[in-house]
Amino acid sequence: MELPASFVDYTRSLLGEEEYEKLAVALQQEPPVSIRFNNEKWKMQDEGLSAVHSPFDRVPWSSEGVYLDERLTFTFDPLFHAGCFYVQEASSMFVEQALRQYIKEPAIMLDLCAAPGGKSTHARSVLPAGSLLVANEVIRNRSQILAENLTKWGHPGVVVTNNDPADFADLEGFFDVILTDVPCSGEGMFRKDPVAVSEWSPENVEICWQRQRRIISDIWPSLKPGGLLIYSTCTYNTQEDEENIRWMRDEFGAEILPVDAPAAWNITGNLLAGEDFPVYRFLPHRTKGEGFFLAVLRKPEGETVRIRYKSTV
Protein backbone atom coordinates (compact mmCIF):
# COMPACT_ATOMS: atom_id res chain seq x y z
CA MET A 1 0.00 0.00 0.00
CA GLU A 2 1.36 3.41 -0.99
CA LEU A 3 0.10 6.05 1.43
CA PRO A 4 -0.62 9.60 0.22
CA ALA A 5 2.37 11.89 0.83
CA SER A 6 0.24 14.53 2.57
CA PHE A 7 -1.14 11.89 4.94
CA VAL A 8 2.37 10.66 5.71
CA ASP A 9 3.66 14.16 6.45
CA TYR A 10 0.73 15.15 8.64
CA THR A 11 0.52 11.89 10.58
CA ARG A 12 4.28 11.80 11.16
CA SER A 13 4.12 15.29 12.66
CA LEU A 14 1.11 14.27 14.77
CA LEU A 15 2.55 11.04 16.21
CA GLY A 16 6.28 11.66 16.03
CA GLU A 17 8.79 9.74 13.94
CA GLU A 18 9.00 6.57 16.05
CA GLU A 19 5.25 6.12 16.53
CA TYR A 20 4.52 6.93 12.89
CA GLU A 21 6.96 4.25 11.66
CA LYS A 22 5.22 1.68 13.86
CA LEU A 23 1.86 2.77 12.46
CA ALA A 24 3.16 2.57 8.89
CA VAL A 25 4.32 -1.01 9.47
CA ALA A 26 0.95 -1.95 10.99
CA LEU A 27 -0.90 -0.50 8.00
CA GLN A 28 0.89 -2.98 5.71
CA GLN A 29 -0.38 -5.95 7.72
CA GLU A 30 -3.65 -7.83 7.43
CA PRO A 31 -6.40 -6.35 9.63
CA PRO A 32 -7.70 -8.51 12.50
CA VAL A 33 -11.08 -10.23 12.18
CA SER A 34 -13.58 -10.02 15.02
CA ILE A 35 -17.16 -10.97 15.70
CA ARG A 36 -19.67 -10.19 18.44
CA PHE A 37 -22.08 -12.81 19.74
CA ASN A 38 -25.81 -12.28 20.16
CA ASN A 39 -26.28 -13.76 23.62
CA GLU A 40 -30.04 -13.81 23.16
CA LYS A 41 -29.56 -16.42 20.44
CA TRP A 42 -26.13 -18.01 20.83
CA LYS A 43 -24.33 -17.52 24.11
CA MET A 44 -20.61 -16.96 23.83
CA GLN A 45 -20.04 -18.77 27.13
CA ASP A 46 -21.71 -21.96 25.87
CA GLU A 47 -21.25 -23.73 22.55
CA GLY A 48 -20.64 -20.57 20.53
CA LEU A 49 -16.91 -20.21 20.96
CA SER A 50 -15.98 -23.86 20.55
CA ALA A 51 -18.04 -24.01 17.36
CA VAL A 52 -16.63 -20.93 15.67
CA HIS A 53 -13.14 -20.42 17.06
CA SER A 54 -10.72 -22.36 19.23
CA PRO A 55 -8.51 -21.19 20.78
CA PHE A 56 -9.76 -17.60 20.91
CA ASP A 57 -8.84 -14.13 22.09
CA ARG A 58 -11.45 -11.96 23.75
CA VAL A 59 -11.94 -8.34 22.70
CA PRO A 60 -11.08 -6.77 26.08
CA TRP A 61 -13.59 -3.91 25.92
CA SER A 62 -16.55 -6.01 24.73
CA SER A 63 -18.48 -8.56 26.78
CA GLU A 64 -19.39 -10.60 23.70
CA GLY A 65 -16.57 -9.83 21.25
CA VAL A 66 -13.84 -12.23 20.11
CA TYR A 67 -11.04 -12.21 17.55
CA LEU A 68 -10.83 -14.92 14.92
CA ASP A 69 -7.65 -16.37 13.47
CA GLU A 70 -8.85 -15.79 9.92
CA ARG A 71 -11.70 -14.32 7.94
CA LEU A 72 -14.33 -16.97 7.34
CA THR A 73 -16.91 -17.06 4.54
CA PHE A 74 -19.66 -15.66 6.74
CA THR A 75 -22.23 -15.44 3.95
CA PHE A 76 -22.33 -19.27 3.85
CA ASP A 77 -22.97 -19.55 7.60
CA PRO A 78 -26.64 -19.99 8.59
CA LEU A 79 -25.83 -18.78 12.11
CA PHE A 80 -24.72 -15.46 10.64
CA HIS A 81 -27.96 -15.09 8.72
CA ALA A 82 -29.92 -16.06 11.83
CA GLY A 83 -28.38 -13.14 13.74
CA CYS A 84 -26.42 -15.34 16.15
CA PHE A 85 -23.33 -13.15 15.68
CA TYR A 86 -22.31 -9.96 13.90
CA VAL A 87 -19.00 -9.36 12.11
CA GLN A 88 -17.79 -6.09 13.65
CA GLU A 89 -14.47 -4.30 13.79
CA ALA A 90 -13.11 -4.75 17.31
CA SER A 91 -12.20 -1.18 18.25
CA SER A 92 -15.71 0.08 17.43
CA MET A 93 -17.00 -2.23 20.15
CA PHE A 94 -15.61 0.30 22.65
CA VAL A 95 -18.99 2.08 22.41
CA GLU A 96 -20.17 -0.56 24.89
CA GLN A 97 -17.95 0.89 27.61
CA ALA A 98 -19.50 4.36 27.31
CA LEU A 99 -23.05 2.99 27.37
CA ARG A 100 -22.48 0.66 30.32
CA GLN A 101 -20.74 3.36 32.35
CA TYR A 102 -23.27 6.15 31.88
CA ILE A 103 -26.64 4.59 30.94
CA LYS A 104 -28.13 2.82 33.96
CA GLU A 105 -31.86 3.42 33.36
CA PRO A 106 -34.11 2.77 30.33
CA ALA A 107 -33.22 5.32 27.66
CA ILE A 108 -34.28 6.56 24.24
CA MET A 109 -31.23 6.42 22.00
CA LEU A 110 -30.60 7.61 18.45
CA ASP A 111 -27.90 5.99 16.33
CA LEU A 112 -27.74 8.72 13.72
CA CYS A 113 -25.48 7.23 11.02
CA ALA A 114 -26.28 3.60 11.73
CA ALA A 115 -25.79 1.48 8.57
CA PRO A 116 -24.88 -1.28 8.20
CA GLY A 117 -25.83 -1.88 11.83
CA GLY A 118 -22.80 -2.97 13.87
CA LYS A 119 -23.09 -0.29 16.52
CA SER A 120 -26.90 -0.41 16.50
CA THR A 121 -27.07 -4.14 17.19
CA HIS A 122 -24.38 -3.70 19.83
CA ALA A 123 -26.11 -0.76 21.52
CA ARG A 124 -29.41 -2.63 21.55
CA SER A 125 -27.69 -5.54 23.31
CA VAL A 126 -26.24 -3.43 26.14
CA LEU A 127 -28.93 -0.78 26.71
CA PRO A 128 -31.02 -1.35 29.86
CA ALA A 129 -34.26 -3.28 29.50
CA GLY A 130 -37.13 -1.02 28.46
CA SER A 131 -34.95 1.20 26.25
CA LEU A 132 -35.80 2.24 22.70
CA LEU A 133 -33.24 2.54 19.91
CA VAL A 134 -33.91 4.67 16.82
CA ALA A 135 -31.46 3.53 14.13
CA ASN A 136 -31.22 6.07 11.32
CA GLU A 137 -29.49 6.04 7.95
CA VAL A 138 -29.73 8.91 5.48
CA ILE A 139 -28.93 6.82 2.36
CA ARG A 140 -32.01 4.85 1.41
CA ASN A 141 -30.47 1.61 0.13
CA ARG A 142 -28.17 1.48 3.17
CA SER A 143 -31.15 1.96 5.47
CA GLN A 144 -32.64 -1.21 3.99
CA ILE A 145 -29.48 -3.13 4.86
CA LEU A 146 -29.64 -1.63 8.35
CA ALA A 147 -33.24 -2.78 8.78
CA GLU A 148 -32.35 -6.29 7.61
CA ASN A 149 -29.46 -6.61 10.07
CA LEU A 150 -31.53 -5.34 12.98
CA THR A 151 -34.33 -7.74 12.05
CA LYS A 152 -31.83 -10.61 12.11
CA TRP A 153 -30.57 -9.45 15.51
CA GLY A 154 -34.11 -9.83 16.78
CA HIS A 155 -34.65 -7.24 19.51
CA PRO A 156 -38.11 -5.62 19.36
CA GLY A 157 -37.15 -2.27 20.92
CA VAL A 158 -35.88 -0.77 17.65
CA VAL A 159 -37.19 1.70 15.07
CA VAL A 160 -35.37 2.16 11.73
CA THR A 161 -35.60 5.55 10.01
CA ASN A 162 -34.31 7.06 6.77
CA ASN A 163 -33.85 10.78 7.51
CA ASP A 164 -31.39 13.64 7.22
CA PRO A 165 -29.96 14.72 10.59
CA ALA A 166 -31.75 18.07 10.30
CA ASP A 167 -35.09 16.23 10.32
CA PHE A 168 -34.61 15.36 14.00
CA ALA A 169 -34.13 18.96 15.17
CA ASP A 170 -37.83 19.46 15.86
CA LEU A 171 -37.80 16.57 18.35
CA GLU A 172 -36.42 19.00 20.89
CA GLY A 173 -34.94 17.35 23.97
CA PHE A 174 -36.24 13.92 22.94
CA PHE A 175 -33.21 11.61 23.09
CA ASP A 176 -31.28 10.55 26.19
CA VAL A 177 -28.35 9.36 24.08
CA ILE A 178 -27.23 10.12 20.53
CA LEU A 179 -24.47 8.15 18.83
CA THR A 180 -22.94 10.05 15.91
CA ASP A 181 -20.54 7.84 13.99
CA VAL A 182 -20.10 10.65 11.51
CA PRO A 183 -18.94 10.34 7.88
CA CYS A 184 -15.19 10.94 7.84
CA SER A 185 -12.10 10.78 5.65
CA GLY A 186 -11.63 7.10 6.53
CA GLU A 187 -7.94 7.02 7.42
CA GLY A 188 -8.62 4.16 9.81
CA MET A 189 -9.96 2.08 6.91
CA PHE A 190 -6.78 2.22 4.82
CA ARG A 191 -5.70 -1.39 5.31
CA LYS A 192 -9.25 -2.76 4.92
CA ASP A 193 -10.36 -0.71 1.93
CA PRO A 194 -7.97 0.38 -0.88
CA VAL A 195 -10.64 2.82 -2.09
CA ALA A 196 -10.24 4.76 1.17
CA VAL A 197 -6.58 5.35 0.28
CA SER A 198 -7.31 6.47 -3.27
CA GLU A 199 -10.09 8.85 -2.16
CA TRP A 200 -8.13 10.49 0.68
CA SER A 201 -6.92 14.07 0.29
CA PRO A 202 -6.37 17.11 2.53
CA GLU A 203 -9.29 18.72 0.72
CA ASN A 204 -11.55 15.82 1.71
CA VAL A 205 -10.47 16.16 5.35
CA GLU A 206 -11.47 19.82 5.14
CA ILE A 207 -14.88 18.90 3.73
CA CYS A 208 -15.38 16.20 6.35
CA TRP A 209 -14.77 18.26 9.49
CA GLN A 210 -17.16 20.93 8.24
CA ARG A 211 -19.81 18.35 7.38
CA GLN A 212 -19.37 16.79 10.83
CA ARG A 213 -20.01 20.13 12.54
CA ARG A 214 -23.12 20.67 10.46
CA ILE A 215 -24.42 17.24 11.48
CA ILE A 216 -23.76 17.88 15.16
CA SER A 217 -25.42 21.31 14.98
CA ASP A 218 -28.47 19.79 13.31
CA ILE A 219 -28.87 17.03 15.87
CA TRP A 220 -27.91 18.88 19.08
CA PRO A 221 -31.39 20.34 19.80
CA SER A 222 -32.92 16.85 19.92
CA LEU A 223 -30.62 15.77 22.77
CA LYS A 224 -32.09 16.15 26.25
CA PRO A 225 -30.41 18.54 28.67
CA GLY A 226 -28.06 16.29 30.61
CA GLY A 227 -28.12 13.76 27.76
CA LEU A 228 -25.08 12.11 26.21
CA LEU A 229 -23.63 12.53 22.74
CA ILE A 230 -21.18 9.81 21.73
CA TYR A 231 -19.01 11.07 18.88
CA SER A 232 -16.93 8.67 16.81
CA THR A 233 -14.96 8.48 13.58
CA CYS A 234 -12.65 5.99 11.86
CA THR A 235 -9.88 8.49 11.18
CA TYR A 236 -6.65 9.68 12.82
CA ASN A 237 -6.36 13.43 12.21
CA THR A 238 -7.21 15.96 14.91
CA GLN A 239 -9.33 18.16 12.61
CA GLU A 240 -12.08 15.54 12.53
CA ASP A 241 -11.43 14.32 16.06
CA GLU A 242 -10.09 16.48 18.92
CA GLU A 243 -10.74 19.80 17.20
CA ASN A 244 -14.39 18.90 16.74
CA ILE A 245 -14.66 17.84 20.39
CA ARG A 246 -13.11 21.13 21.47
CA TRP A 247 -15.55 22.97 19.20
CA MET A 248 -18.54 21.22 20.81
CA ARG A 249 -17.23 22.11 24.25
CA ASP A 250 -16.76 25.77 23.36
CA GLU A 251 -19.83 26.18 21.12
CA PHE A 252 -22.42 24.23 23.11
CA GLY A 253 -20.96 24.23 26.61
CA ALA A 254 -20.72 20.43 26.46
CA GLU A 255 -18.93 18.57 29.24
CA ILE A 256 -16.38 16.05 27.95
CA LEU A 257 -16.67 12.87 30.01
CA PRO A 258 -14.08 10.19 30.77
CA VAL A 259 -14.64 6.52 29.94
CA ASP A 260 -13.01 3.84 32.07
CA ALA A 261 -10.22 2.26 30.03
CA PRO A 262 -7.46 0.22 31.70
CA ALA A 263 -3.91 1.06 30.63
CA ALA A 264 -3.47 -2.54 29.45
CA TRP A 265 -5.83 -1.81 26.54
CA ASN A 266 -3.21 0.59 25.06
CA ILE A 267 -5.77 3.14 23.93
CA THR A 268 -4.21 6.42 22.82
CA GLY A 269 -5.46 9.67 24.35
CA ASN A 270 -5.59 13.30 23.28
CA LEU A 271 -3.13 14.29 20.52
CA LEU A 272 -4.13 17.95 20.27
CA ALA A 273 -1.37 20.26 21.49
CA GLY A 274 -2.34 22.25 24.58
CA GLU A 275 -5.46 20.14 25.37
CA ASP A 276 -5.92 17.26 27.78
CA PHE A 277 -9.65 16.49 27.70
CA PRO A 278 -10.42 12.75 27.53
CA VAL A 279 -10.73 11.09 24.12
CA TYR A 280 -10.05 7.52 23.04
CA ARG A 281 -8.14 6.66 19.87
CA PHE A 282 -7.35 3.15 18.65
CA LEU A 283 -4.11 2.98 16.67
CA PRO A 284 -3.48 -0.38 14.97
CA HIS A 285 0.14 -0.62 16.11
CA ARG A 286 -0.95 -0.25 19.74
CA THR A 287 -4.35 -1.97 19.89
CA LYS A 288 -5.75 -4.93 17.99
CA GLY A 289 -8.18 -3.09 15.76
CA GLU A 290 -8.50 -0.25 13.28
CA GLY A 291 -8.37 3.56 13.53
CA PHE A 292 -11.40 4.20 15.72
CA PHE A 293 -11.87 7.45 17.70
CA LEU A 294 -14.49 8.09 20.41
CA ALA A 295 -15.44 10.86 22.81
CA VAL A 296 -18.43 11.25 25.13
CA LEU A 297 -20.05 14.64 25.79
CA ARG A 298 -22.86 15.66 28.13
CA LYS A 299 -25.29 18.40 27.17
CA PRO A 300 -25.55 21.05 29.88
CA GLU A 301 -28.69 21.16 31.97
CA GLY A 302 -31.09 24.01 31.26
CA GLU A 303 -32.83 25.47 28.26
CA THR A 304 -32.16 23.91 24.88
CA VAL A 305 -30.40 26.38 22.59
CA ARG A 306 -30.77 26.04 18.83
CA ILE A 307 -27.49 26.58 17.06
CA ARG A 308 -26.90 26.23 13.36
CA TYR A 309 -23.39 25.73 12.04
CA LYS A 310 -22.74 27.54 8.79
CA SER A 311 -20.34 25.73 6.50
CA THR A 312 -19.37 25.79 2.84
CA VAL A 313 -20.15 22.06 2.45
Question: Where are the regions that the model predicts?
Answer:
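S-adenosylmethionine
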Residues: 1-313
